[in-house]
């Protein structure tokens, strides 16, 4: 923001006396732990002193929902084709996480062991960095000895997947896959392509209790089509 303002004033400052409002945009993650709030305040106060007639607008955007909710999925199938293992989840990247395909926004991915609630984080792997056994088959085990999977969604869209991820163990059916920090995208951009249901909305209390606020069914999709 500080660099942007310097450029903005240098290039467009001569027109500032003719405007009443200045919108500095969004994307300011001021709720992030290492965000320098005091520096932000000083920058805005300094700008206001230079141009006291301006009404300055700042859009915190996703800062309101930063790290406030994750998308929980489950492995429902694991398929292998030409040496590539794809774990099919009960969520859809096209329907529930379109930013992962469009931007692409890449959330942190982790697994949860439902037996002891232990968790491990997966690592995103670039396709060009994957070693090949031959011209058509990619290695299912990385050089570090970890296991390679592609994450696939549950819609009929052929492009409903997001790349390759490295896990420290072999995945099994029923295993939970968590997509961190997804609530601010999932809740506003999700859609019901071909009847794929919205994820349920729930609160996880400090004592571990899960409270379901809203669940969706086929009738929700049907009513939208009426």
PLM regions: where:
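Charged (often Lys/Glu-rich) extended helix/loop segments that serve as interaction or gating elements
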Residues: 43, 55-226
